[in-house]
């Protein structure tokens, strides 16, 4: 049965559109921003079983897509390197990797993540394991990837979903074979967390001219 947004949720969507218009003012026009948030909303409603997180997720998904669109329309020589981390559910490995990339790369790298079959929430064992090392991913929500985001990324890291990812010429694709944290305890997730840190550090060392934060 199709999801129907409440009056309050529809108001939240309008407020989200206003925030995005302020954020991208002077860069993207109002029509483009409204088209992207409406398209993002339609995509998410088509997948959802509940409307609870739809307004927040639609805003975040649209923001990432608009960030990607700005990259695609900009001079490549003026841009930071960008990485897209993909796994099946965008609930464990890709969220942890994105968390590490943001922590270690700071504002010198643009980070995106997504999943081929997004879960309802981020894996709690992954959240706890990352919090132990000072990386907060508790506020993240799994989301799908979009064509603009894939095209805007310089490096696309897949973890268990490579066959589902569209291939574009000129992109660098890397497949990381790592255990899926799903169903694992915090103790079992820690080695995955630490291996992701090592791999993200190595990737950032290739992409960034200065040493990464440790």
Which role fits each region the language model picked out?
Residues 2-39:
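A short N-terminal interaction module
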Residues 2-5, 165-214:
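Phosphate-binding/catalytic loops
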Residues 91, 161-164:
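Short glycine-rich anion-binding loops that position phosphate/pyrophosphate groups of nucleotides
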Residues 149-151:
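A short, aliphatic-rich alpha-helical micro-motif
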Residues 154:
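Conserved acidic residues
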């Amino acid at each position: 049965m199709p999801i129907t947004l409440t009056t309050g949720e529809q108001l939240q969507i309008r407020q989200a559109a206003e925030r995005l218009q302020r954020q991208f003012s002077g860069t993207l026009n109002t029509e483009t921003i409204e088209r992207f948030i409406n398209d993002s909303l339609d995509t998410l409603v088509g997948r959802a079983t509940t409307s609870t997180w739809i307004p927040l997720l639609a805003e975040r998904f649209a923001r990432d897509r608009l960030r990607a669109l700005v990259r695609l329309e900009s001079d490549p020589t003026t841009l930071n390197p960008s990485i897209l981390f993909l796994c099946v559910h965008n609930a464990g490995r890709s969220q942890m990797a994105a968390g590490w990339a943001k922590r270690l790369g700071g504002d010198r790298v643009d980070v995106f993540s997504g999943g081929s079959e997004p879960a309802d929430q981020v894996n709690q064992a992954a959240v706890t394991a990352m919090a132990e090392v000072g990386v907060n991913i508790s506020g993240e929500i799994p989301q799908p990837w979009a064509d603009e985001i894939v095209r805007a990324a310089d490096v696309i890291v897949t973890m268990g979903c490579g066959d589902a990812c569209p291939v574009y010429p000129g992109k660098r694709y890397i497949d990381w074979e790592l255990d899926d944290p799903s169903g694992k305890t915090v103790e079992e997730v820690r080695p995955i967390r630490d291996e992701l840190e090592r791999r993200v550090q190595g990737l950032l060392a290739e992409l960034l001219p200065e040493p990464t934060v440790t």
